[in-house]
Design a protein with these regions (language model features):
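Short hydrophobic/aromatic-rich motifs at helix boundaries and adjacent loops
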Residues: 14-18, 38-41, 61-63, 84
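Short juxtamembrane and helix-loop transition motifs at transmembrane-helix boundaries
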Residues: 37-49, 63-74
């Protein structure tokens, strides 16, 4: 499996690639949660545009922020990714319902979130190998 050294550990290049990918995901999601938690005009208007009332903007931002915090902490990163998958699935469903042409964007963010963990966490590679170790 690419990124695994001969002794079975994750290579330094794989770890750094995973950190960079995860870092980009975290930066985007922190920005998104901040505009919602602070109830900035862009966050409120965007939420109203997709059919949600203005009073749910801050709670949505807090939920997203909690998911991101769990994703950033190495011990809880997989739980954070699972919760982010649910959050991003809801965003995708909302965007599909509104016929938004960018409906795949949350899917891409979710894929990158999982790819970042997969590249840097040997536990996830063991749990979900991309290929069988049997010949």
């Amino acid at each position: 499996m690419p990124g695994i050294t001969q002794n079975g550990s994750v290579s330094k290049a794989s770890i750094w690639a995973g950190r960079i990918i995860s870092g980009l995901v975290v930066l985007f999601l922190l920005f998104d949660s901040a505009i919602k938690v602070l109830a900035l005009a862009a966050g409120v208007e965007g939420t109203i545009r997709v059919g949600y009332p203005a009073n749910v903007v801050r709670p949505i931002g807090i939920v997203l922020l909690a998911c991101v915090v769990l994703y950033v902490i190495p011990r809880t990163a997989i739980l954070g990714a699972i919760l982010l998958t649910g959050y991003l699935g809801g965003a995708t469903a909302t965007m599909v319902r509104m016929s938004d042409p960018w409906f795949l964007f949350p899917v891409v963010i979710g894929v990158f979130a999982w790819l970042g963990i997969f590249l840097r966490d040997e536990r996830l590679r063991t749990l979900m190998p991309l290929r069988s170790s049997a010949p």
